[in-house]
Amino acid sequence: MSSQIEPDAEAAKQRGNELFAAQDYEGAIKSYSESMKLDPSQWTYPLNRCFAHLKLERWTEAEADATSVIDLDESNAKAWYRRSLARKGLGKFASARADLYSYGRRTRDFKIVVEENSKIAAMEAAIVKASVDSPACRFKFVDTSNHGVGAFATRSFERSELVLVEEPLYTVSEIASPRQIATAVSRLTDDERTELSLLHNTFPDRFDDSFVGIHRTNAIAAGEDSSVLCLRASRFNHLCTPNARYSWHAPSKTFRIYALRSISEDEEILVSYISGRNIYGSSKAQRQARLQSMLGFVYSCTSCTLPSAEQAASDRRRQELTQLWDTVPHFPPSQTAARLNAIARAIRLMKEEGYDADEDDFTNDAAVICAFHSDWESAVYWGIRTYESRVAEFGADSRRAMDEEVLRFLLEPQKHQMAGRGTRKVFKTRV
């Protein structure tokens, strides 16, 4: 009687491990596949095969294997991390980030999250920048029936995905004089000046030089004291509940637009020309006054032309947000729970208003409060929300996402300058 039997799943896995160590990834994949056939309930085998596929840059196969592991064991941190790598390779950048965050929450290894997130950001930015003026461009400009030219998505977007990366035509001081603007324009090529002349000018009677009027109409703030002129970014229209966000990326000196929420193919991509509390904490009348001072005419977006009852409710929400912003810093230490509840209330109001930006205006304060009272779990929770918000709106490789205080809450909340100064308390407030 023959003693020859089919190798069991563990033996096949061991062979696969030996082949993997010898860098025979094809052979390892075959052995791991054999293990999976013998015992499809064991997550170790697809996890190992996923790693071999990653080594061969077979992103689709690696993604499928990691997903099968997650289906078998949702708590498996390695599977989330490896699927993030696979999705980065596939160009599924928003999904790659989401998987990376799942890995971080399970392991608290936020150093890896920050490092890998920066790599994802760099790869995505390079691809998006190269796609402009090509069939792969993520948007197209279309004449609308009621508000001029607008940018419309040629594919769907998820929150945090890049829509545009653009080098500006020129950069000047935010308070540049007409002569300084004219000097910047004079340095452009003839073709660039021709393209610039096609942009809208809302001040034709105010400036003798039409390029100065075009600049005043279309220039965008870049950093604390500069403004830039971008041929493409300037054509995106405004909405007081935008689905995308302007962002100046100082390290690369490029202007970027990020999706703030899901955007469908053929949907118009809309940004806000004003920011912070000037947008989310201002009534319709206040916003329109600011826009008129900037643009020279009354700009009425769909968020400013709601039925009267809805408009009044919107104004109340935004005015309450300003009140919360003003009062949150003044709660005494004895009322920290109420202070956190006020922060959570502000974030919920933003969501009710359909406003998907600037959450970090409140969450960063919450992280400091919790660290002050040595509630490290809550400090990390609010720190994660701050980091994820800034990554989505400014990029993982931006100065705001890489801010030392933000990263401190992820990596070492106990070392924050305010950590442990108050009475130890534990808070349950979450959003």
Regions from the language model: what does each represent?
Residues S2-E124, A337-G422:
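Alpha-helical protein-protein interaction scaffolds
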Residues A11, L38-P40, L47, E57, ...:
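Eukaryote-biased feature marking scaffold/signaling PDZ-domain proteins and nuclear chromatin regulators
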Residues N76, F93, T154-E158, L162, ...:
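Conserved tryptophan-centered aromatic signature that marks the ligand-binding surface of SH3
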Residues Q4-E6, H238-S389, A401-R408:
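C-terminal SET catalytic tail plus cysteine-rich post-SET Zn-binding segment of SAM-dependent SET-domain
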Residues A122-T183, H238-L260:
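Conserved AWS/pre-SET-to-SET junction and N-terminal core of the SET lysine methyltransferase domain
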Residues D143-G148, A222-S226, A289-L291:
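Short aromatic-glycine motifs in intrinsically disordered, low-complexity regions
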Residues G422-V431:
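C-terminal helix/juxtamembrane-tail motif
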Residues L164-Y246, G281, S293-T305:
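Catalytic cores of histone-lysine modification enzymes
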